[in-house]
Amino acid sequence: MKKKTVLALLVISSALMLFGCGKGNESADDPVVLTPIIEQIPEDEASDAAEEVAEQPVDEDVPPEEGMVRSRITNEWVDEKVNNTRPVAIMIPNSNTASQYGISDASVLYECNVEGSMTRLMGIFDDWQNIEKLGNIRSCRDYYVYWAFEWDAIYIHYGGPFYIDDIIGRDDTQNVNCITFTDATYRDEAKNSTDNAFTSPDRIRKAMDHYGYPMEYRENYADAQHYMFAPAGSPNTLEQYPDAISASKIDMSKCYPVTNCYFLYNEETGTYDRYQKLSGSTEGPHIDMANNKQLSFKNVIVQNTYHEVRDQKGYLAFQCHDTTRDGYYFTNGKGIHVTWKKESDYGSTRYYDDNGDEVLMNTGKTMVLIVEDGDSFTADEKALTAKK
């Protein structure tokens, strides 16, 4: 029981009168003894007060350090300067001979088929000025440029087929072709001689200075709010959807038969860890050679997309602008069916649940898997495909 002491003070004038009436040998200088009065606070009130202090909510939107803001790409805390700097979009091969550096730092990672059922990756890097080595860099495919547009990113590639000429030649396209501007890359030790072109922050800045590209976002291009994020303190668990499916494993091997990638939900981290079995390689975690980290994502999106085969070489075309296609959104070990819309070159691809509401993504990195319409994949061995 908590106690508080209330001192009963004697009125000085009354004390003098009392001592004056005493025996002659008693002195007015004798000390006055003050008797404490003990008041007890009821136990239930004390516990209520303690609980009230303990239940004070933590404000998730208070920056951990001065000068930090929520990233427009991941909703994570980043330095305000990073948030105001345009990201870079880098084309990265995904084969057993690829030497991938810095890929685990991509805020958003796209994967899509190219010719021969191989996949190519494109990383959107917001904090690229703090990544020592990025790459290796490979050639462009025109449909990736439209996804890079959504972020107003500087698009970095190593040449590409003639199909890219129109979009790369546009005045508003701000790209760095490492064949044309050789100072943007350097050759370094790699698994083979065709996958050894890398870049770095100083080389990217040099290329941007050369072409006169602004470091900060251009006005009236990409949407300032791309993904819609749930509050960091109240993540989207998908429990509000009665038809949400279990998704502890997302297997994309039928869509990507050369990559054979899949994702396992990690309950300890709350993210999806990426694995793959590349043609000619062994199965295992997808690892960034720069830091030996496995690729991991808070959000995984499967985006069914109309496609065509362009020629006998197998070059593909994907319809990046659409309002009629669907897909799936996965997070926290569950998934829901979604539809998606992209209505302009720089407009964001937006995802909607079956109620027509825009899906709230969770704070963290996002994997976007572009699949050919009609292809199927599995979530916990349940086959899923487009609902046309």
Where is each model-derived feature located?
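Positively charged n-region of N-terminal signal peptides that target proteins for export
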Residues: 1-5, 11
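Sequence-pattern detector for short linear motifs
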Residues: 5-7, 26, 73-75
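Compositionally biased, low-complexity segments
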Residues: 9-10, 43
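C-terminal motif of bacterial Sec signal peptides marking the signal peptidase cleavage site
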Residues: 17-20
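Bacterial signal peptide processing site
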Residues: 22-24
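A surface/extracellular/periplasmic glyco- and lipid-processing/surface-interacting theme
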Residues: 30-39, 51-110, 115-388
